[in-house]
């Protein structure tokens, strides 16, 4: 592999044939994986598909839990294949399950398989009732070998280290383009570049019910910045202060229209997305 410097502190690998890097993006449907996908396309890489961990339990230390089926909508919007991987959120087994699923993809295969979903695969996708299944949503299959996995991790050493160790075992590169990015500039960049970000949950003092389901504008980011300073929380939500979903982005061809119900306990809240379709 030849290493090329991007001039921005990152190094990018290309194969000796100079073909574009062929990558998968670990996508949750949220803001950081949306940025990671956009970052990959800007480098001219071949994004072979989106991979989403679908947590069936109530929590996970590694992966986002709510609204991750939106990554399937995003994949269809960009005409990319999707690989949903169901896990229970047990930290003793979740990385092993992810690795086993990727092992069947990253090394490629000369066998041609239909991208049509089997009944078992549809069950694994855990598609929410009431969401319109995109007719063009293809299931990711092994074809050409994968060179790297791109992840939207920002400051979680726990997540980054485990992903890097897994990628080393799989024999692929790991890229974290957002690693240690400054939160304020990251949030402003997302909005200015055309990522339509909504807050799907809030759980910190200073963020009330009115933030739930809101599409963030530059003014909203400035307000978030002020609130974060007063209430001492992370403006990018990296401390678990809020979760996000992206309903449109520069790498997507269609927007996602959602219908939701707001739930508020008085101290925290979330939205239940009961309807979604591409428009």
Annotate each predicted stretch with a short phrase.
Residues 2-199:
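ATP-dependent adenylation/nucleotidyltransferase module used to activate substrates
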Residues 16, 73, 235-238, 264:
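Sterically constrained small-residue positions within well-ordered secondary structures
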Residues 46, 118, 128, 132-134, ...:
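Short linear interaction motif-like sites in intrinsically disordered regions of transcription factors
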Residues 69, 93, 160, 184, ...:
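A generic structural micro-environment signature
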Residues 98, 223-224, 273:
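Generic hydrophobic, helix-prone segments enriched in Leu/Val/Ile
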Residues 180-189, 206-220, 261-275:
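Short flexible/disordered coil segments
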Residues 199-256:
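A conserved mid-domain beta-alpha-beta active-site/ligand-binding segment of alpha/beta enzyme cores
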Residues 241-279:
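Long hydrophobic alpha-helical segments typical of transmembrane helices together
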